[in-house]
Amino acid sequence: MEDFVRQCFNPMIVELAEKAMKEYGENLKIETNKFAAICTHLEVCFMYSDFHFINEQGESIIVELDDPNALLKHRFEIIEGRDRTMAWTVVNSICNTTGAEKPKFLPDLYDYKENRFIEIGVTRREVHIYYLEKANKIKSEKTHIHIFSFTGEEMATKADYTLDEESRARIKTRLFTIRQEMASRGLWDSFVSPREAKKQLKKDLKSQEQCAGSLTKVSRRTSPALRILEPMWMDSNRTATLRASFLKCPKK
């Protein structure tokens, strides 16, 4: 699973996930499913904010990243992916500026158009079950909840999906692709089932032992986007390029 994550996701997302797990004292070598889940959640949060800006009239517009109008205000503030101290600093700043009620738990995004915090969920189960779990945990009508599944289903507070249909379709397509890629490698069942995950962990550890000593150093590029958490969209060409840059365990 760890190899899959490093091949499938943008290196910046992988690095953020590694930092998050380290902050909470979690071992990504052991909790590989959580590693994959965090990377998936991060990417969905970035895609959610992708290309969405607010113009001078306060209207929400969609602009490509290479458009000169990209200097307009981002519609969404990304909170997910920051260390806890910085994340709460951002939340406090938003609350002081907008008058929004401070949430009890760290949300994932803030929507400057609708003036509300957003909690993003990505689930391998039924969307309505996960939605209820989120709602019971947050216990606040002020925080908007939006849940996506790997099967293309979604659920949001008061059926308000925030984004246009095309933007949501990109997220659903990406999640479905991740599921298909996992399935093709025999990883999906272990990603869904804890029992299967234990079996897969044993296979992963055995595979790592076989690969020990065969890896060479891979250069890491640090993008400015990592520091400012700019949104990104992993198109097929970019994914193919990233995959080519990573090493695989040599076939014997």
Swiss-Prot record:
Please name the GO terms that the record assigns under molecular function. Answer: RNA binding
Example GO BP = viral translational frameshifting
Key words of the record: Decay of host mRNAs by virus, Eukaryotic host gene expression shutoff by virus, Host cytoplasm, Host gene expression shutoff by virus, Host mRNA suppression by virus, Host nucleus, Host-virus interaction
The places in or outside the cell where this protein is found are: Host cytoplasm; Host nucleus
Q: Which domain of life is it from?
A: Viruses
Instruction: Write down the position(s) of the site called Important for efficient shutoff activity.
Output: 28, 65, 202-203, 206
Q: Where is the active site?
A: 80, 108
Q: Does the keyword Transcription apply?
A: no
List site positions: Important for efficient shutoff activity and nuclear localization. 195, 198-199
Q: What is known of its domains?
A: The probable endonuclease active site in the N-terminus and the basic amino acid cluster in the C-terminus are important for the shutoff activity. The C-terminus acts as a nuclear localization signal. The C-terminus is recruited to host protein complexes involved in nuclear Pol II RNA processing.
* Assigned protein family: Belongs to the influenza viruses PA-X family.
Q: What is the recorded function of this protein according to its Swiss-Prot or TrEMBL entry?
A: Plays a major role in the shutoff of the host protein expression by cleaving mRNAs probably via an endonuclease activity. This host shutoff allows the virus to escape from the host antiviral response. Hijacks host RNA splicing machinery to selectively target host RNAs containing introns for destruction. This may explain the preferential degradation of RNAs that have undergone co- or post-transcriptional processing.
What protein does this entry describe?
Protein PA-X
Q: Which organism is it from?
A: Influenza A virus (strain A/Malaysia:Malaya/302/1954 H1N1)
